[in-house]
Curated annotation (Swiss-Prot):
The gene is pheS. Tetramer of two alpha and two beta subunits. Pfam families: Phe_tRNA-synt_N, tRNA-synt_2d. The lineage of its organism: Bacteria, Pseudomonadati, Pseudomonadota, Alphaproteobacteria, Candidatus Pelagibacterales. Keywords: Aminoacyl-tRNA synthetase, ATP-binding, Cytoplasm, Ligase, Magnesium, Metal-binding, Nucleotide-binding, Protein biosynthesis. The keyword Nucleotidyltransferase does not apply. Belongs to the class-II aminoacyl-tRNA synthetase family. Phe-tRNA synthetase alpha subunit type 1 subfamily. It is found in: Cytoplasm. One of its GO terms (cellular component) is cytoplasm. This is Phenylalanine--tRNA ligase alpha subunit. Mg(2+) binds at E255. NCBIfam families: pheS (TIGR00468). It comes from Pelagibacter ubique (strain HTCC1062).
Amino acid sequence: MSDIKKIKDEFLLKLKENLDLNQVNQIKTELFGKTGLISSQFKQLGKLAEEERKKFASDLNLVKSELENLITIKIDDIEKKEINKKLEKEKIDITLPERPFVQGKIHPVSQVIDEISSIFSEIGFSVEEGPDVENEYNNFTALNTPDNHPARDMHDTFYLDDTKELLLRTHTSPVQIRTMLNDKPPFKIIAPGRTYRSDSDQTHTPMFHQVEGLHIDKNINMGHLKGCLNYFIKEFFEVDKIKMRFRPSHFPFTEPSAEVDIGYEIKDGKIVIGEGDKWLEVLGCGMVHPNVLKNVKVNPDEFQGYAFGIGIDRLAMLKYGINDLRAFFDCDYRWLNHFGFDPIDVPTNYRGLSR
């Protein structure tokens, strides 16, 4: 018993000292480790007579419990002091003025996509999406693009494997193919999204944005296409009148095909869309080729339709006076702050597309 009391008194004094966490853990090991002082005392129990063993075990357990409690209290106290010390060092001065609130801006491309979607939704179009990585069939073959067409060349298209089965889509027309394969006519959709071509200069980037439109139904003709595009261009540029001309062109997936120019004039160094004696190309369009309809199991004798493709980046440049396409992708906050839009002000036809 004298050994137990001696151990107890010695370590009670030690635990009253100003210790750090490592020192307390070391004391804990000295007492209760495999070869610790208290652990060694328990090993002596087998050598004692029964009565003596009972009393010794009782006294030993009391000392063990007391020392364990003191060690736990000591550790808690040290940890609290360390936390308080850390908090004191990291405390925040709530009297300091707050940092200025910086509100982000909507990128012009995102704004124009929202504007286009809003305009076409007013005349019954729905918005469809598809993957950026496409297969060769949806991107070329189903769209009546022959094997020897220049668009299939490596210098125009980003292929992802040697077989040329997978590629980065060169337009969003594959979304039209996917939609028609998965559903039945009539179809009235637009498909905005990223597209990819191997080109880079002031007016071209390897990745750019397009919106493709498709309307398939019975008795659809070129007049419907002209009316749809006339409505869209007037709404998008927010003008009452628009001067348009359709020039004959060629696209594998439409017949007849046309490129659309709009009239404009220069006033005070700015392009004014609507009237004027100058012309500006804005999009390509045409009546959907019968072969395309056959490829998606739609009877071309029963259903007809039109399609169009518009460069979103180009429209944004024209409408908002942006001269260099590459600036769209430079991640310059100053540029975005100047050309960006209020994220709360969602474009609608009723309140105005851009304010």
